[in-house]
């Protein structure tokens, strides 16, 4: 079975945060919740120090520690390697957030919007089931599944590719 992976060429990343913005827009995450973020790090030693940018999100681990600590089995791994959360089963204990070595899980207690009231794209994509439960990068599984169902190729066809990659 295919196992999805995301590879970023760090030599080409300029830290523009476009991946972060496109993920936030596609998933209508509330302020402060970044399923995809870009770390700004220093590489080398003085006087030859360079800046590097590293996009980070859920790594959809081969053996996810978040899945093993979940008391309700809300965190699951699909056969294709994508780690998902069943919001109906999640009790919001946040054990998974503590277990995640990439700090890629968030828990939002209440609905918050960038400008107090939801913008058009926020209301359309706002999911009330994601309140008081753990959330994380979904690898845009809805886009991948819909694309595969219509014969599109993830990574080639934008409609079938995670938003942060486009």
Question: Where do the language-model regions lie?
Answer:
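Non-ligating segments of multi-cofactor redox enzymes
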Residues: 1-166
């Amino acid at each position: 079975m295919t196992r999805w992976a995301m590879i970023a060429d760090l030599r080409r990343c300029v830290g523009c945060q476009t991946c972060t913005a496109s993920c936030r827009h596609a998933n209508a995450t509330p302020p402060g919740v970044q399923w995809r973020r870009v770390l700004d790090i220093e590489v080398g030693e003085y006087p030859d120090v360079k800046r590097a940018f590293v996009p980070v999100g859920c790594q959809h681990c081969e053996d996810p520690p978040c899945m093993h600590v979940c008391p309700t089995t809300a965190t699951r791994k699909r056969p294709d390697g994508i780690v998902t959360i069943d919001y109906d089963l999640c009790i919001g204990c946040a054990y998974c957030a503590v277990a995640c070595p990439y700090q890629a899980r968030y828990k939002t207690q209440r609905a918050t919007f960038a400008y107090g009231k939801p913008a058009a794209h926020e209301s359309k994509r706002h999911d009330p089931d994601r309140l008081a439960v753990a959330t994380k990068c979904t690898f845009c599984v809805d886009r991948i599944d819909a694309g595969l169902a219509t014969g599109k190729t993830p990574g080639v066809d934008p409609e079938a590719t995670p938003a942060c990659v486009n």
